[in-house]
Amino acid sequence: MHPPAESDPVRANERLSWAREALADPALDLVRASTDAGFRSYWRTLDHEPSRIVMDSPPDKEDVHPWLRIRALLEAGGVRVPHVLAQDIEHGFLLLEDLGADTFLQVIGDANADDLLDAAVTQLLKLQAIAPPADLPAYDEALLARELRLFDEWFLGRHLGMALDCGDLETLDLVYRRLVDAALAQPQVLVHRDFMPRNLMPVAGGAAVLDFQDAVRGPIAYDPLSLFKDAFLSWPQARVDGWLDRYHARALDAGLPVPSLPRFRRDADWIGVQRHLKVIGIFARLHHRDGKPKYLADVPRFFAYLDGVLPRYPELAPLAALIDGKVKPAIARITEAARG
């Protein structure tokens, strides 16, 4: 199953008709505002004041109920999320306030990063203070392991064409087990799962949070690590360390169950390895299954993150050896082959 093409005339007609009715504006037109890695898309009103956003979630592909549920949960906890002005759940249309055209990813830079990320942490601390509902999915052993397997299935197997021998599989099993155990041992809180600059909007008074529908109960270090070691831009390690320390101090002040700073730093490193491997696999899947090759350009960023962490932990040395000995040579081969 592939995401819809850029132009689906039937769906476009339904979307426009609904927006015109919701806003009582028969002359209204829409222009694409953004899309995501799935099937959801966002459309901005043209020549309508104030500007609004239509979120289009085709019901057979993107159930809008989780988005609405988590939005309400976050709003009740004081997190700044988009306001819903109208909705048609049956057809998957929501009318939202327009928070602007730029996310943190578009506006962040060396000069303003400290202030922007501090605003992001303000929202994150509110999010993590919310008690996860009893029926919220957990970042449990099965989910953590399933995500890790995306790396060997989609990146090593499908993208690189690597045939893993018994020793390779044992290495991955061993390291994956250690990563999963470490994640489960962390204090568990509400986790956004993609708390990063492209899912944060600059608004008056701070930041607004987007793309929260996949929230789970999971490791406390997951979201701050995702924020400071982003999928689409990198920062010097010294700066990342400073932000992690600042988050830790603020989390302590907020009464969140963070461990000691050295333990938190280790937890962030280890859950980062899990996330980096997962995202490498997802980016390969987006290319090969969903026809979205642009994400592959950011894969080297994640190997750089791994290079910075794996050598510090002897328990993760088998993974470092596999990456250096087999994965990087395979990447070099396909890169050379692609150049012709």
Label every PLM stretch briefly:
Residues D152-H159, I220-P257, W270-D290, F302-V309:
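Active-site activation/catalytic loop segments of kinase-like enzymes and analogous catalytic loops
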Residues L116, P187, H192, V216-R217, ...:
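Secondary-structure capping and boundary motifs in well-ordered enzyme cores
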Residues S34, R40-L144, R149-L150, L156-G161, ...:
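ATP-binding pocket architecture of kinase catalytic cores
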Residues A113, D140, L164-D168, R266, ...:
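Residue-level recognition of alpha-helical structural elements
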Residues M1-F93, V189, V203-A208, I323-G340:
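Conserved NTP-binding catalytic cores of kinases and kinase-like/nucleotidyltransferase enzymes
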Residues V10, E14-R15, E21, P132-A138, ...:
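An alpha-helical support segment within catalytic cores of ATP-dependent transferases
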Residues R32, F39-L46, V54, F93-L94, ...:
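Active-site acidic catalytic loop and adjacent metal/ATP-binding pocket
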Residues P3, G281-G340:
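ATP/Mg2+ or Mg2+-diphosphate-binding catalytic cores
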